[in-house]
Structures are given as C-alpha cells and as structure tokens.
Amino acid sequence: MKHTLSFMVWAILAVLLPLQMAQAAAPPTELQKRLQNLPDISDIKPMQSDAYPEKYVFFINQLLDPHHPEAGNFKQRVILSHVGFDRPTVLVTEGYAAHYATHPRYQEELSKLFNANLVFVEYRYFGESMPKPCNWDYLTVENSLYDLHHVTTTLKQLYDQKWIATGISKGGQTTMFYRTYFPDDVDISVPYVAPLNKSLEDGRHEPFIANKVSTPENRKRAENFQLEVLKRKNQLLPMFEKYCSDKGYTFRIPIAEVYDFNVLEYSFALWQWGTPVNKIPETDADDHTLFKHFMAICEPDYFSEQSPYPSFNVQAAKELGYYGYDIKPFKKYLTIKSSRDYLHKVMLPPELSNLKFDKTLYNKVVKFLKENDPEMIYIYGGNDPWTASGVTWLKNKKNIKVYVLPGGSHTTRIGSFDTDTQEKIKTQINAWLNKE
C-alpha cells in the first residue's frame, strides 16, 4: 500500500512539475508586458479563469486624499479579465471587497453579454484595499471616486474602446456617484438596485414595506411572524442568546434589545432577498421551527461587534444614508422604547458614535441627474425595499432608462426580466456602444 501511494505521488509530480515549470518559463503575454509598463501598478499575478482568456490581479497605488497628497498612499486591489484590446471594457465599481471576483468561474453579466474586458475595483477600506493605519477620515465617497478615476485613466492606455461602469447595491450607488463626479470617464453606466438615500434614516423604506411590497396578504403574513417571535420572547430569547454566544458575537447593547432589532430587521431582509412567503412558518409552529427560520432570514452578526461591514456602517452614517424601522405594530412587545438613531447606538464603535450625516452627496447627485441626461440604465426589483429610495422619479429623459422588475428582489439583473425587456435593454446598450 505504501509503495503504491509513493508511486502515485511521484506520478502526479511527474505530470504537474513540468506543467508548472512550463508556465513559469512561458514568455509574458502582450497584456502582461503592457501592464508592467503602466505607472503605479505592482504585484501583477496571473489568475485562473474559466470565462476569460487571461485574468490578472494587481495593485494600484492610490492617494489616501487626492486633495492632500501629503496624507500618504495605499494599495488598491484590481482584478482584470481580458478579452481583447479591440473590445469594450466593463468597469465594476464594487462597493465592498473583491474576494468573489477572484473565483475562476466569476463572470459579470454585462461583460458576458457584450464580450467585454472586465476591470473589477475593490472599494477602499475593504478586503485587501484597507489602508494601514486605518484612518476613517479618508473613507469618503469622493475619495473613492478619485480611486476609480485613477484606475480608469491608467487602464485606458490599454483599452481605448467604449467603457461601461456598473455595480450592484452599494456598487451601483458607486456607479451613479462616479458618473456624477466624473461624467466623461465612461460612456455608459448601469447601476443595479442602487438606492439614493437622503438621510441616515431615509423614511421611504418603512411605508414601502408596509404598503407596497408583494400583496396585503403576504405583508400580513410577514408581520404576523414578527409579532409571534416577539410574543414568544421568553422562550426564544434564551435560544437567541445561546446562538449568539456559540457564534462568538458580542454587542454594544443588551441582548434583549438586539433581539428586538433583529425582529425589526426581519421584514427588510425577507423582501430584500426575495424569500418565498410560503417559507414563513405558521404562527402555531413550534419554537424550534420559528427560531430556525428567524435565524435563516436575519443573522444577528449584522448588529454585532464582529459585523463584516464596519466600513460600510461608517459610510452610511456619514454620506450614504440608510433606513429606519417602524415600531408601531410591535411596540407592545418590544424592550426598546425607540429605534431612532439605531445605527449610531448599535452598529458604530463608541469613538465614531458622533458622526453627522452630510446631505451634500445626495444633493449633488439629484442635481446632476435632473440637469443632465447621461447614457444610463437603472435596474431595480419591485419588492426590494431599497427601491423605495431608488432613482425611479426621473421624468422626460431621452437617455436615462429605469427598469423595475415586478416582484423582483435585490438579486434583480437584466437576465431576470422577460425576453422582450432583456432585448430592449441589450439593444439600447449596443446602440450606445456602436455610436461614434
């Protein structure tokens, strides 16, 4: 057995080692050579891809504060998937970390539809693009847009055909903001499910959930579940506390209050991700069934000190805005007296709890969209609570198009629509790509 195993190991090595040596000895491609000659780019490494002929990850040197170069620099991660120098380029303005784009099977929708190169930019202060030391003062939307501007102007030395900016959720917001601040950097913008919030607790999401998503019967079923989980708090809170303890979660507020906020978050999470209503347990279900569903929809790490999104919470408090909770239907059963200003109290560390929301970004984007008509397509889901603060209010625009998928969630994409609508969107983008 040992001899057989040794032989198999040597046989595998005999095959793999020459392959690895051949790869190491392979001359650099034209793209590699041109990448190496670009300014501010370093640490270029090839990656495996099932969808693109060539794929690389590299870092680009960025200013922490473009208006004050003396503040220093950081390195931002970029993933480049290459189709051809004669093809258009899709710029993904990611709002978070870039980990998922490193997967060999990753392929962005627009890049696939239009056979385009793909430039995926990780957001500053996320993933491997975290400055050291971490100074939150430099985490601003404007600074992030200068990051994109530097990436785009640098890579346009390689790709001189049309550019499409796109992103999902916070990435979609970034696409919209980028077009506002640097309107000529790209030719087309396609933000997916992108909210434009006007305050820390915008105020449009709560009535949207209460009155507009799905049907009255389905909304009532979701609300009844929330009420039942609150009514059974004496039985379920110990299960909740053990669940959080086992996961290693800690919180800035008492566990009974965390429970309340998790219940309030339930309806937003349910509709955001399009969970089928028939998955909601009946109110006479046993405790275990209720609790299992509750945790499946609303993972409490969202409110914990271990939350994976501290950078986002800072931005929401400063510029991006967020949503509030309507406690009126549940007030009788809640430990908390009010949910107002919960992001500061629950989701920010004490040293950042005094952050003030600045409406400048919102006002600038609204003004830009009203006064201009860039080539943009907005994609939204009809049941997604973020659509409440989406850009669905523009009128009399020739170029800006808004598509809302009835019943759609935060996962809505072009491919989610019916065939006729998909063709309409693709035809419009193709026309823009082919315009001189």
Model-found features: residue ranges?
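Catalytic-loop region of hydrolases
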Residues: 24-116, 420-422, 427-436
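Conserved alpha/beta-hydrolase
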Residues: 111-128
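Alpha/beta-hydrolase fold nucleophile elbow
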Residues: 159-169
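Short glycine-enriched nucleophile-adjacent loop
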Residues: 172-183
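A catalytic-pocket lid/entrance helix-loop region that shapes and gates access to the active site
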Residues: 186-243
